């Protein structure tokens, strides 16, 4: 599989077909046991993982915010993050109204696993974190599935806008993602059985 910069790739298949494994290998969370994986013509085994991960944003299935402030969760130790970048990310994922409703705003403490957050707001925090550094590649597993359809689709429009030059690799139950992608991979038993470009 070769994915070009700027492609928006939708991965589909039944449960257990290998979607999650493929996304986690491509995002550097898993090492493949066989085969080779190249990034910009360098084999993955030669890649500086820390540098690679600094250029990607990802949300894995069932991920939750960690204990700490909302701000900590979004900037994730990135002291270079500007106020403009923060506002852009919060507005883009429609988190600003929620933040403004909180007495402590971004300094609001999140309990372990984001227990006091709605599932929708928890996903918005993860989405803001994934884009705030304006990464080159986004890897998403069910990133908007806890949101109502209207809000989810508006956020998908923002994420997939042509203004954003990142590559997107996504697996989701929300069919709207598929309409915004230009390449479609179908997985079955750990194999890519179909690869269609729009």
Language model features with spans:
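Catalytic Walker B motif of ABC-type/P-loop ATPase nucleotide-binding domains
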Residues: 138-142
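ABC-fold ATPase nucleotide-binding domain signature/coupling loops
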Residues: 96-125, 143, 190
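Conserved "ABC signature" C-loop
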Residues: 63-109
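The feature captures the beta-strand-to-loop junction immediately N-terminal to the Walker
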Residues: 12-14
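Helix-to-loop junction immediately C-terminal to a conserved catalytic motif
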Residues: 27
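Conserved ABC transporter NBD signature motif
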Residues: 35-44, 52
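Conserved catalytic loops of ABC-family nucleotide-binding domains
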Residues: 158-172, 178
